[in-house]
Amino acid sequence: MTGVQTCALPISGLYEIRIGTNILYTDAKGDFILQGELIDTRARRNLTEERVEKLTAIKFDELPLKNALMQVRGKGERKLAIFEDPNCHYCHKLEKEIATLDNVAIYTFLIPILGENSVEKAKNIWCAKDRLTTWSQWMVHEKEPAAATCDTAAITANLELARANNITGTPTLVFTDGTRIPGAAPLRRIEELLTASAKK
């Protein structure tokens, strides 16, 4: 248990319990625990979902962008960070999906969480002379990255960053307003979130 929240709940006598980013509810004595979502039917809002989104928000400005592959398309006025594993099927799908995104700076944090082969591929990509081309060739065209060696402390740091922010799956997209989307979102949704986060 990481904390008990005793405020901002609209029901008297109901308290929030947080376990990581999971939310449970209890009474004042802790005799009962309720697992599920708290819905405000009048406002048609899922209060549990809103709370989890707030708890999992990532401060984009604090991301160590030097540890990411950076790709600028057009003016790069919009920004997007993506945590990806080179062997993740949905990451491959996402890379093909976002190929047409324009006016965006994309920061890809390599987090090889799917086994030793992922670690090897991530290192080969990070150590390549042309990281972006090597990444794109592998993710979009399935061209195996050539063996390469260099300092891979950035990959270790990325894994620690993912753990600290409870990023347990790939891809995970992070927008400048802190919004986090797990999974390969459709292009239309990504465009909407890029536009919305740029206005905040």
List the model feature ranges, each with a label.
Residues 49-62, 171:
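C-terminal low-complexity, charged extensions that often adopt amphipathic alpha-helices
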Residues 2-9:
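Short, small-residue-biased leader/transition segments that mark boundaries at the very start
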Residues 76-151, 161-168, 196, 200:
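Structural alpha/beta surface segment adjacent to cysteine/selenocysteine redox centers
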Residues 21-50, 163-164, 169-170, 174-200:
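Non-catalytic, surface beta->alpha helical segment in thiol-disulfide oxidoreductase systems
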Residues 59-78, 100:
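A short beta-strand-turn-helix
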Residues 154:
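A detector for short metal-coordination/catalytic motifs
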